[in-house]
């Protein structure tokens, strides 16, 4: 509730004509100074707002707030987004999900379910996926694989981690076509399966080295002689 009050206050200050008082940028207690107002005005007109919300009622409030101020918004979290999927589809607001968020971690996610992504897609909502914290980004394809296992269409899943994020956040199109940057990954099998690995990574048309700390450790500790000395030899 306090966050909504601050947001409403910030947007109200953009339209206020007062040169003094609470809304004035010259007031030491004003929420936004002139630079802050300029930044908020620019973001609200051309930027994208990401609201973290899981509870259905909070998602509805985001939709109402975005419509009131004509904002381009994205829902992040969305554990109960399936409950308000028709409203999300009508508003054209994308949802960023973790497909493994099927158990409530708080009262905000009591309605969490594994087929959340499938229900949203069926209703026409644009769905993206996240693995949560950044150090688990390598597990994103496994997260998406779980969404597919619970009804999310396979081709939509591949798009949800390639072309859809680029379209939502304004990146270059993630398509294979003449004239586009050659950013490709060649997999040993289905990229959404846990036993598949990247055979080759191509970035901007150049082959990326496939060595990493993990592959170097594998070479060092394999039982066969591979030319690398062991880090520690027991006496």
Residue ranges of each PLM-predicted region?
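Polyanionic/metal-chelating signatures
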Residues: 1-73, 197, 203, 229-235
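A general structural motif
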Residues: 32, 51-55, 77-79, 106-113
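His/Asp/Glu-enriched, well-ordered alpha-helical/loop segment
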Residues: 48, 86-89, 94, 98-187, ...
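Active-site environment of divalent metal-dependent phosphoester hydrolases
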Residues: 56-60, 80-85, 136-138
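Histidine-anchored nucleotide/phosphate-binding helix
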Residues: 63-66, 79-83, 117
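Short internal beta-strands
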Residues: 74-79, 96
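C-terminal cap of metal-dependent C-N hydrolases
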Residues: 177-221
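Charged, amphipathic alpha-helical linkers/stalks
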Residues: 222-225, 230
């Amino acid at each position: 509730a306090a966050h909504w009050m601050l947001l409403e206050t910030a947007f109200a200050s953009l339209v206020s004509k007062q040169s003094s008082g609470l809304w004035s940028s010259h007031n030491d207690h004003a929420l936004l100074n002139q630079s802050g107002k300029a930044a908020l005005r620019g973001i609200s007109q051309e930027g994208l707002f990401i609201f973290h919300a899981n509870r259905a009622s909070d998602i509805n409030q985001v939709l109402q707030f975005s419509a009131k101020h004509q904002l381009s918004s994205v829902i992040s979290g969305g554990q109960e987004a399936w409950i308000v999927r028709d409203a999300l589809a009508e508003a054209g607001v994308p949802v960023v999900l973790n497909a493994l968020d099927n158990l409530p971690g708080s009262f905000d996610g009591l309605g969490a379910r594994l087929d959340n992504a499938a229900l949203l897609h069926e209703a026409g909502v644009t769905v993206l996926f996240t693995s949560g914290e950044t150090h688990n980004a390598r597990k994103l394809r496994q997260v998406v694989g779980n969404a597919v296992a619970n009804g999310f269409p396979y081709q939509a899943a591949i798009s949800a981690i390639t072309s859809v994020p680029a379209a939502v956040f304004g990146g270059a199109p993630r398509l294979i076509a003449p004239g586009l940057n050659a950013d490709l990954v060649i997999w040993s099998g289905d990229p959404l399966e846990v036993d598949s690995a990247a055979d080759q990574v191509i970035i901007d048309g150049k082959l990326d080295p496939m060595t990493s700390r993990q592959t170097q450790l594998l070479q060092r500790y394999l039982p066969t002689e591979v030319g690398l000395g062991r880090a520690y030899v027991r006496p």
